[in-house]
Amino acid sequence: MVTIEDKINLFSKIIYGEVDDKINSELDELENVEKDTIEKEEREVKKYRNKNMQSVEKKIKSKFEKEVFKLKLEEQQQLLNLKENMINETLESLKERIIDFTKSDEYINYIKSHLDNTLKDIENKEGIIIYFNKKDLEKFKKVINKDNVEVSNESKDIIGGYIIQDKNNKFRVDCSLEISIEECKEKIGISITELFM
């Protein structure tokens, strides 16, 4: 049976391929712009060197270094912006796929299985409340009938999954799909950063 992790991993591989192509294309473009700018500055330096004295040459060299430094800073900023945009696009695409997943029959089985496993790990189930989003509340309220476990009529603003909490607010187990997305965010960020190295 294909798990959500398998789907996320497959999706990540597909996205990484697309991201890699996009990165390489944009890096080539940035390198060409930097190369053209550097060549232009070098021509200016040679022209001034031939016409002016040594002091003028020092001033031009200083200006050139400042421009190169400025370009490098701009390039770094563009790369940071590109990485951030790629991470956000990937996460948005992942979120859309997860929303589609919540509409499938696999999702119902996933929640039942995941919830059973989560509840097994909780020793004292007295006063436990399970929260779902509005759509899932309708699906699971009748299905989940556990001793000492209450399904709240109050819905949470989550894509899918559930949140378990006790009545005294002493503990909370967040098994919402947003948490899965947040966990993927760091991995996606690391993978995209590695593409630029």
UniProtKB/Swiss-Prot annotation:
Keyword Plastid carried by entry: no
Cellular component GO terms, alphabetical: proton-transporting two-sector ATPase complex, catalytic domain
Keywords per UniProt: ATP synthesis, Hydrogen ion transport, Ion transport, Transport
Superkingdom of origin organism: Bacteria
MF GO annotations: ATP binding; proton-transporting ATP synthase activity, rotational mechanism; proton-transporting ATPase activity, rotational mechanism
Family listed: Belongs to the V-ATPase E subunit family.
Function per UniProt: Produces ATP from ADP in the presence of a proton gradient across the membrane.
Name assigned to this protein: V-type ATP synthase subunit E 2
Organism (species): Clostridium tetani (strain Massachusetts / E88)
